């Protein structure tokens, strides 16, 4: 361990074999860490329980700290643990002979954890040897690779072998850092904290939603959060972790921008370019996974494969003739390349991201846990340019945190940058490096339905798209911004579902950023103006012609505005003047057709104020149901009638002018446009007389319109009243018929039950030897009638039994029908008067149905 390790003489196959061994070592350590994580969690829970119980002095003295059982004399005595100094019972501790002390079960598990994790070994060895194990092997392999590339002598000036590398550097490069990951600001701890914070946030959202018990939307939101709690927690935790990592990267890139780039020799860059072009991007061989950083285990591999990094604009190629290299499929903080295929990206990386690796471009300053002791190691650190993945995590306080800046980072605004006709200076500077990697979601279709998703809903893909543009966030902060656009962007970013895609989609088209809002405002104003205009004729008195024109205009504009609004929700960018003209023509055609059908029933005359009130009622009722244009036109027959009346007025006026002109002389002059013949009359006619005739015609037309409206109103009222009366009569009559039928059926069944009872008695007497004959004389008439009918039935049945042959079938049917009718009429008469029958019908029906059922069973 203390000897100098020289791996410069190994071949490629031997180096690959050594790397496989190192990778197996890392895999075994990862499995061991997973196995011990459950034990660590159990010990943490026990420690938190003890911290709470230890505050009660009476409990500590009289009860066991582990099982909480009370101490008793000679049965369950208390013993003090040698490690935690708590009083425990006999069943919760064991005696250590070599220590001559009692140790509780929890302290024994803690000792076992320390022994299995080899923490005691590294605590003793790290004071003697600064670098050992797998870290030492990788260090030497990296040095060998740097020597082969020829860059190490240029960096160090040939002083690489002058110092002993075994006594240099810091303890951060040793294997103990792997086992100390869970104690410091590691990615695993950060992910655990992010998961806990996300879970608390989801719980708080659920509790807030459940607080509104009277709101159905809140209850639905709470149920959705409960059903998708795990998915939302994972997405939110991933977003928090990416935000922390992005913040560190932005800080390092800002410092890289201020510092000069590290020069690379031409020979090294040429060699790497040749190797990069010869290696295929997807051609990972078996040892390709060996160069995966151990810190990458904190996040799933799917996210790592789906988040390609965006290169910083300051990284320019050293040689313009080189082919552009394929970017690594993993982020720079958790991806490493192979030694034989150097893509000028991080080559080697320790489990916590602290030890040296190969990286091109201007290196960010390294953040090691200890300061190196010599210039050799400093040169290696500068060349490696590896920043810790969890350095300075959680250092920001709540007051210093800028939420607008965080939202600007989370929102991928860089999608709109390539569409900007005037690029920023930073974009012009990076234009010669090749196109910047764009997000896959930038090619989405601008469908408005995609912007109105549920809740739905933020997905894991949105949080991953946020990570794609993390390295361009500091460029957008430096670039000048438009205050209005920035305000609109911030409003778009403040989404309830934490979905930054909305803002990017709304501002994706920079050529027409304000057309949609202006169009929407214009249509909204027009719609409100039409609604206000439709209410003014009822408040302000005016002439009949003005009222008709206003109502006609407002009703048509109201229909058009509602149609525009309904179509605008479907496709706001496809509304043109041509479609509006077509829709308006179709409305007028439908209005003409409806008016011809509905104005044919006009016979009476009614006043104009009643017509206006009816128009307002119909227009208000039609606004509530805007399912289709035809249904609105059917309900707004008053507006349609107004359109028809105005058309008829024009026709009558034109016909009158033609008749007047024909009476004075033949109309031989050519037709001229309406605007020219306006105000012109034929020769030889009196203008005053024509005005009087036209005025009288207009008055007659309006009076006829009032008559039509009055008749329509009366017809509608009569139809409603008739419908109500008809429906009410049908229901009551049907109920009476049902009651009568049920009563009759119950009475028939009751009579049949009595008959069957009598028959059973007669049969019993006959079996006993008695000869029963029907009685002829009765004392009372009422009993005589009833018994005569009953005895008639019994007599007929007894006679049928005594006859040698059954009677004819037709006679049997006739006899049974006649007797049934008589029994029914008799029982119906005995129910009482007609006034009491309706009151007792329901109760009697229910009571009589039960014996009917019993009689059916007896048959």
Curated annotation (Swiss-Prot):
Which GO molecular function entries does the Swiss-Prot or TrEMBL record give? actin binding; myosin binding; protein kinase A binding; small GTPase binding; zinc ion binding
Question: What are the RabBD domain coordinates in residue numbering?
Answer: 4-124
Q: Point out residues bearing the modification Phosphoserine.
A: 298, 350
Highest rank taxon of the organism? Eukaryota
Q: Name one Pfam family in it.
A: Rab_eff_C
- Polar residues bias (residue ranges): 618-629, 787-796
Low complexity: which segments have biased composition?
435-450
Region entry Disordered: which residue ranges? Answer: 251-285, 302-374, 386-629, 783-812
Expression tissues? Detected in brain, skin, heart, adrenal medulla, pancreas, intestine, liver, kidney, muscle and testis.
Chain residue ranges for the region called Actin-binding: 495-856
**Matches recorded under InterPro entries:** FYVE_2, Intracell_Transport_Effector, Myrip/Melanophilin, Rab_BD, Znf_FYVE_PHD, Znf_RING/FYVE/PHD
Keywords in alphabetical order:
Actin-binding, Cytoplasm, Cytoplasmic vesicle, Metal-binding, Phosphoprotein, Repeat, Zinc, Zinc-finger
Query: What is annotated about its quaternary structure and interactions?
Result: Binds MYO5A, MYO7A and F-actin. Binds RAB27A that has been activated by GTP-binding via its N-terminus. Interacts with PRKAR2A. Interacts with components of the exocyst complex, including EXOC3 and EXOC4.
What is known about what this protein does?
Rab effector protein involved in melanosome transport. Serves as link between melanosome-bound RAB27A and the motor proteins MYO5A and MYO7A. May link RAB27A-containing vesicles to actin filaments. Functions as a protein kinase A-anchoring protein (AKAP). May act as a scaffolding protein that links PKA to components of the exocytosis machinery, thus facilitating exocytosis, including insulin release.
Q: What is this protein called?
A: Rab effector MyRIP
The gene it comes from is MYRIP
